[in-house]
Amino acid sequence: MQTLGAPAAERLDRVLARADAYRLLAAAFRDPDGPLPGDLETDALIDAVEALGVTVAPSEREAVRPIEDRPARAHEHRAIFGHTVAHGCPPYETEYGRRHIFGQAQELADIGGFYGAFGLRPANDGERLDHISCELEFLAIVALKEAYAVARGHDDAATISRDAAGAFLRDHPGRWLPALAGQVGRSAPHTGFAVLASLAARVADVHAAELGMVPDHLGPDDIRPIEDEPDGFVFTCGVDDADPAIPG
């Protein structure tokens, strides 16, 4: 590995902080009762998001602490997100802003295309591809690939990762995370998940701005839940079981 100058080293630190923020947020949003539960590492998460310039208020820290305990987090997760996409705060992108079921199918296919371009495959028993945890985990992996390229002075590879992250943010999480944050904040104010949803939206916003992207934000009133999955489009996700090999 080559010795990095100060600007490259600072950039590497920021990219790694972003990877940590996305990874820790993704883990926090996994269903605590599901087959791939994650942990909530509050201190590490706060350190990562604040390294990106996102301020975490004392009241937000206090709201998140109680759900570090998995049973408590599972209880709050069930209360807010429920077990169906038709619940009032669905953590799925395609329940927001679409006009018809075919639009959902197209959005899922587009999300899957981003994942596939980075060698990621759905895991058995995981979440649907448009779940917040899947989208955040994808951004974490893309950030790690960018960090790998920066550390080795591979500018072209770093640019590929940045461009992919920018396009994904513009078309997907950068658009709908503000809607989820608004919906959870309205339905369950002062809860740990209201804070986590807000942090996810703010981290994505800062990232998009750095990349020169201006996503067309959706709001909580743009939710359009449906009861059934479109035929042939029942997806799951969980990149823990994938093998996103980083090229040497």
Question: Which residues fall in each region the model found?
Answer:
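Surface/interface-facing alpha-helical segments and adjacent flexible terminal/loop regions used
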Residues: 1-248
